[in-house]
């Protein structure tokens, strides 16, 4: 058997764009034959997948799955919205959500987990090779309670449990599971619409709160208000801010005459026990990803060899 050197792995990686470990495996499987190793990578779709991995993937689907006291939400990105309507891609997202439910929300653990004899990472690469677009498991999150429910809501669903936005909400309660699930779904819909930053003021980033205080204070200093008056105005302004960005203090979208906290308290009678919102996660597709702008005319010119 030929000795596989670092230089050989480097050369194969440069010629195919495949990962280092994949290149080493390809050379080992093919007794150091470079051309055979390249073909091996192509057959497995790894060379093609790696070449596409540099392209921006900002579309795709959010997958959400909840069962009883546990729930997960995942984001799987593709390059175009068209792929989100592809049955293979949709199945991949649902499979990833199930694996995340089983092994936890660590992205690397999810990618290493196997479904049958195939890892999730391999399944993603196979889909890239088949569909022809870059894809990536971007992030995952999970919530769990000791008693109660975790509910979910998917906005813009293209299939059950997958769409353009996904929310999971955890409710701790000894109450009736069916009533809790219904309440949890209502709150998840609220989170999707209202986009709270935290459950309550204590969960806000101190830097965000400081920035808000500074903006308010500077505004009234420019108006010539004395410092003792500014302090009171800022405190009042912060209370208004909390009502805008903290879930428990927001006006409930299903009944704007009460806050989310009040709505939850009023639901306790129907639920049959005290209810506490233990947490929530809201994923909107592509948030924070800078999408690539394309010049269609330039692409056509490039394809035809013109400048």
Swiss-Prot record:
Annotated stretches, region: Involved in Mg(2+) ion dislocation from EF-Tu: 80-83
Gene3D superfamilies cross-referenced by the UniProt entry: 1.10.286.20, DNA helicase RuvA subunit, C-terminal domain, Elongation factor Ts, dimerisation domain
Function: Associates with the EF-Tu.GDP complex and induces the exchange of GDP to GTP. It remains bound to the aminoacyl-tRNA.EF-Tu.GTP complex up to the GTP hydrolysis stage on the ribosome.
Lineage: Bacteria, Pseudomonadati, Pseudomonadota, Alphaproteobacteria, Hyphomicrobiales
One Gene Ontology term of the molecular function aspect: translation elongation factor activity
Main location, first listed in the record: cytoplasm
Subcellular localization: Cytoplasm
GO process annotations (BP): translational elongation
Record carries keyword Hydrolase: no
CDD domains xref list: UBA_EF-Ts
Pfam family, one: EF_TS
Superkingdom, natural source: Bacteria
GO (cellular component) term, any one: cytoplasm
The name this protein goes by in its record: Elongation factor Ts
Family assignment from sequence similarity: Belongs to the EF-Ts family.
The entry's keywords: Cytoplasm, Elongation factor, Protein biosynthesis
Entry coiled-coil feature ranges: none
Keyword Cytoplasm: yes
PROSITE patterns cross-referenced by the UniProt entry: EF_TS_2
């Amino acid at each position: 058997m030929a000795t596989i050197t670092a230089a050989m792995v480097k050369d194969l990686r440069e010629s195919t764009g495949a990962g280092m470990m994949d290149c080493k495996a390809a050379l080992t499987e093919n007794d150091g034959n470079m051309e055979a190793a390249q073909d091996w990578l192509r057959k497995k779709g790894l060379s093609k997948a790696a070449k596409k991995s540099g392209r921006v993937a900002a579309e795709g689907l959010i997958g959400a799955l909840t069962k009883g006291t546990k729930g997960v939400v995942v984001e799987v990105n593709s390059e175009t919205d068209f792929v989100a309507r592809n049955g293979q891609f949709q199945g991949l997202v649902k499979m990833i959500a199930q694996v995340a439910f089983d092994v936890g929300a660590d992205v690397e653990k999810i990618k290493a987990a196997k479904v049958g004899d195939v890892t999730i990472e391999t399944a993603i690469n196979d889909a890239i090779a088949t569909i022809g677009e870059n894809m990536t498991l971007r992030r995952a999150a999970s919530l769990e309670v000791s008693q109660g429910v975790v509910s979910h809501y998917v906005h813009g669903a293209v299939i059950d449990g997958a769409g353009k936005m996904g929310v999971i909400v955890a409710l701790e309660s000894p109450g009736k599971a069916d009533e809790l699930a219904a309440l949890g779904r209502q709150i998840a819909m609220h989170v999707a619409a209202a986009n709270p930053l935290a459950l309550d003021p204590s969960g806000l980033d101190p830097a965000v709160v400081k920035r808000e205080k500074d903006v308010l204070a500077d505004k009234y200093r420019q108006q010539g208000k004395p410092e003792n008056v500014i302090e009171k105005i800022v405190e009042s302004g912060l209370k208004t801010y909390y009502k805008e960005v903290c879930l428990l203090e927001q006006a409930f979208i299903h009944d704007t005459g009460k806050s989310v906290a009040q709505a939850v308290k009023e639901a306790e009678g129907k639920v049959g026990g005290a209810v506490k919102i233990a947490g929530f996660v809201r994923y909107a597709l592509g948030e924070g990803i800078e999408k690539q702008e394309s010049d269609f005319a330039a692409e056509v010119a490039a394809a035809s060899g013109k400048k």
